[in-house]
A protein has these predicted regions:
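Iron-sulfur cluster-binding cysteine motifs and their immediate structural context
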Residues: 1-18, 24, 28-51
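Short Fe-S-cluster ligation motifs
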Residues: 27-40, 56-62, 66, 155-159
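Short helix-loop-beta junction
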Residues: 84-96
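Peripheral docking tails and interdomain loops at the edges
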Residues: 159-199
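Disulfide-bonded cysteines in secreted/extracellular proteins and peptides
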Residues: 3, 23-29, 33, 72, ...
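Short N-terminal binding/cap micro-motifs at the start of the first secondary-structure element
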Residues: 77-81
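Cofactor-cradling patches in redox/metallo enzymes
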Residues: 97-175
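A short, flexible N-terminal coil/short beta segment enriched in small residues
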Residues: 43-75
């Protein structure tokens, strides 16, 4: 079971056993759950999914991309916020949604977003590895691992794997996040708009 804090065990029938005293509410288990049944108060697959669906998607005739950013609320989202406060500009075609931890990102959100006409999805989270900065220890690492396998799903949908990107961001990277976004938007423009536009 994917929990960086060991809050989920299995019984003899391999059903999950939750130890709420160890749970830090990072949502990493929610991101790993294929049937989207794990949720927390004020944070669930449905609440984030609703935010993703609420974004206006330009139609195929407008020739404007729409890019979703799922940003860790601990480092990446504050860096985006600080970029705005410092008037550092980046593409107007992105829409950022904060997530509790990058580890909480469920691949269903990615495929739902791309199926509904988003041209790309960028995930921004804390640094992983030996000198990790993830507030939930392995959340970012687990998200990177999960996203490394999404290419096959995208190919089945007839989409390029480059439409999904994961970036490590520090809370002080306010100028860098703007640059990463603009580079990604340029990459999406080069690939072309999503063939899913108009079908969502």
């Amino acid at each position: 079971m994917e929990c960086p804090f060991g809050a989920i065990d299995e019984d003899e029938k391999r059903f999950p056993l939750f130890n709420e005293e160890r749970c830090r509410r990072c949502g990493t288990c929610m991101g790993a759950c294929p049937v989207r049944v794990i949720s927390f108060e004020n944070y669930s697959c449905d609440t984030v999914g609703s935010q993703i669906k609420a974004v206006n998607i330009p139609d195929e005739f407008e020739e404007k991309p729409r890019i979703l950013i799922l940003a860790c609320e601990n480092d990446a989202y504050p860096a985006l916020d600080m970029a705005g406060i410092q008037r550092i500009t980046y593409s107007a075609y992105v829409r950022a949604i904060p997530v509790r931890c990058l580890g909480s990102v469920n691949t269903i959100w990615i495929t739902d977003a791309l199926n509904s006409g988003y041209d790309g999805v960028m995930m921004m989270g804390c640094k992983k590895g030996d000198d990790y900065q993830c507030h939930f220890v392995k959340g970012s690492e687990m998200a990177h691992y999960r996203m490394s396998k999404i290419g096959d799903t995208l190919k089945q949908l007839g989409l390029e794997p480059e439409r999904v990107q994961t970036q490590e961001v520090a809370i002080t990277d306010n100028a860098r996040v703007a640059r990463l976004i603009d580079e990604y938007v340029a990459q999406i423009n080069e690939i072309g708009l999503s063939p899913m536009k108009g079908f969502g």
